[in-house]
Amino acid sequence: MQEQEEYMEIRDKLKNLPKIKSDDNFEIMLQQKINLAEAEMQTISEKQNYSTDEKKSFFKKIFTRKTNYWLIPALGTVVIILIIVTIYYPYKKTELIPNAPVSQTLSDKVSDSPNVSRQTTIEEKKIENKLAEKNTTSEQSSDVPPKDIKNLDGYYRGGIEKELSQPTPVTPMKSDELRIKKNDDIETINAPAIEEQQKIESKSKESEQKDSRIIESKKEEERKGGDLSIEKSAPANKDEVGKSGKLKGAKEYKKSDKKNNRAVTDSTKTNEDDLEIIRNEILEKEKNK
Amino acid sequence: MLEVSNQHIDNKKLSDEELIIAFQNGNVAAFNELVLRYKDKLVNFLFRYTGNRDDAEDLAQDTFVKLYRSKHLYKEIAKFSTWFYTIAINTAKTDSRKKNRYNSISLSEFDPDEDKDYELTANVISPEDSANASMEHHYIQKAIDALEDYFKEVIILRDIQDLDYDEIAEITGLPLGTVKSRINRGREKLKKSLSKIYNNKT
């Protein structure tokens, strides 16, 4: 109460201050401001509605059944095509690349361009060596008999097992030759595959020689025994047959040759079995005669 | 016309809270009734707060526009007058901040040796206002203008607008004790400033 009495004078002065009244134009001015505010609100709401309508119409155009229901399968096909293009083809390409004949392409480029002298790098040599090694190993693993008649003779003589164990001869290709340009002189270097093939050929020759020696020793033994004749035993080679020229049992030789071919196809039989079969056949023929 | 006149009579009988609810339901006549009831009170309050009649009128119109646009924000929990004065004070405060930015003058530009900025407000009482009001009223208004804003608003609401302490506390968002102490401190400051003015006058 004392505080109120203390400030009573000021309170009275403040209360006695004249009340300010608004202008006569107050309501008109207020109406104008309200109209402006409403116009702003309408523009804002129109913008919002326009944006929402635009979105709705966009989605309706795509997904409504009434208007564009045919778009659904079309979009599906487009998606499938995209998947094929983006995923299938790149994978297909990657699959094809490793199967491509790399050795041919690389080496043929070197060999088939004799006019153009190319410097082969160490890396290319290494690649060639690796490829040659792969070829030899793959050929060693295969049990297919050689197609040459000479080799068949070798099988007939009893070197089937050796032949099977030995790698089949690889015909040297032009591509296996590497040309190196050294001080404007072109040098040809044989690839390691050729060298290996040469070794194999030399081994096969040695084996043939051994077989021929064995046969000759057998013939000698037969002569000593007086039962067996040279006519009934097949020669080491056809060349030898040609040289001798006057073999009486030529027909029989042909027959035995056919049988030998059959024997070659049965690659699973061992050398000893083959020898026994041959001996038995010879003995039977003699008995028949 | 009869319906309009009947509606006008009915609106006069309604309380402020009922009117704002009617306006929320789309009754524009209720809004007109609220304008009629509060336009003078609001202009008077804002004139004492700003010290400028034109500004007071503009701010009062802006307050009504805000009421028109944000009618849906009112809830029956509070008194309408409390909510409405809160809108008015906020609009007045934002306006005064804007004006203080533009009316402040930096003196450091003229005196490069001085680092401090002296800000002078450019509030000038118009000749019309000074002619209408008596000299005493003019000095009292000058003393109110000299007060800080947080003293000014509570003194005007209490001693000029005759609002309760509780209502002032709700409008300002302050505790009741703070409101009372601020009112007393404001009165004390006002007394001192008025005594200085009168001493200078004599």
What are these regions (language model features)?
Chain B
Residues N44, D58-V65, A78-N90:
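Structural recognition of an alpha-helix C-terminal capping motif at a helix-to-coil junction
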Residues Q24-N25, F64-K79, K98-K99:
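Sigma70-family region 2
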Residues S96-E119, A131:
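Short, basic/polar amphipathic helix motif occurring as a linker/hinge flanking DNA-binding modules
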Residues V35-R53, S70, I144, S193-K196:
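Amphipathic, Lys/Arg- and hydrophobic-enriched alpha-helical face
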Residues H72-E76, T86-L107, R185:
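Arg/Lys-rich amphipathic alpha helix in sigma70-family domain 2
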Residues L14, Q141-T178, K192:
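Helix-turn-helix DNA-binding module
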Residues E114-K142:
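Acidic, proline/glycine-rich intrinsically disordered inter-domain spacer in sigma factors
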Residues M1-K41, K192, T202:
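N-terminal module of bacterial RNA polymerase sigma factors
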